[in-house]
Amino acid sequence: MSEAESIVLTGGRVIDPASGQDAFLDILIEGERIRAMGPDLHNQYPQASVRDVRGSIVTPGLIDIHTHVMVGFGDFCLPPDAVGVDAGVPTVVDAGTSGAATFGALRRAIIDHPDTRTRVLAFIDPCQIYLANKGFICHKLEIANDERNLDPALTARVLEAHDAVIVGFKVRPTYTDDPRVSPFLEAAKSLAGDRPIMIHLGGFPHTPVIRTTDVLAALRPGDIVTHAYRAGSGTLDKAGEPTAPIREAVARGVRLDVGHSSGDFHFPTARRLIERGLVPTTTSTDLNVFNHSGPVESLAETMSKIWALGPSLHDVLRMNTVEAAAAMGRADTLGRLEPERIADISVLRIEEGPTLFSDGQTSYRGERRLVAEGCFRAGHWYPAQPHPREEAA
């Protein structure tokens, strides 16, 4: 779409959780930006082309803050567009696939590549290397708990050079000597400034991690606990009640993120925490090649699972728009629908009817699900593509 072209979305139910707006409105897009919102814009701007979205929900562009999309730097990454614009999601965030030593190459190969249509941002690992080529994941190389992998000076330079796309750190809280302290978490805290730290909650293959109690105590307001709703992570006590450390962390401003993955989201745990008021701040997928065909599938499917556990539709949309933007320090540019903002817009529909959701371990019945129809990314329309599961059917 050139700067001179314009399009009107008409007939949709526009929900902008940031402003509380929920109304049937038209949206005028000119070039890369939203120019106007209101009734009957398709009549006021007859020169604009029209996209009829009657029966659909129109939201700020969805944001998935935990994915793995650095293809070529690990055997488990997915192409960014497969989990991004092709799934109705204009913005995805890679969660720690790269450390400082590889980030420049990954930015050129993935983030800034002309074939990448999705906006890709990144949490980086505080280590120099998290992954190596040929599928040698750090779990196998055992560099995740080797302090020689830390180079604070290099990491500081990379943060400065790539400030436009690095939103914070993703930390696996492994330890070396003292089982109560992760030098990798401490390194991230010393470098992060006002950037958030996303912490991996739970076990880590082949390398020891500090206890959940110590992890939560070390986090700052604005930091993010991903995999917050996994089973056996120390967020519930033996009586099934939220522990004091998780309550205290949330009270001081730590954010809870779903980070579904293959085995890091557990319906019974999530239901209990949500019933007790510990609702996700953000819903993310941790999408990678091992869970794309199931149980995760897509961001819309993951949002549907949270919706089925009690939060309202507005709450679920809020988690992946304004809250996701705020969590990564981009609330000034992303996560809202208003004139002069970049035209990142997601279009969804609700499929009514009994639905069986899977978390990879257990199943749960819901009454409806969200399905992506497509999205605008900076004013360009991308229809949602069939999921691999649908193509195989």
Mark where each language-model region is:
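Divalent metal-coordination and catalytic microenvironments
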Residues: 12, 27, 32, 55, ...
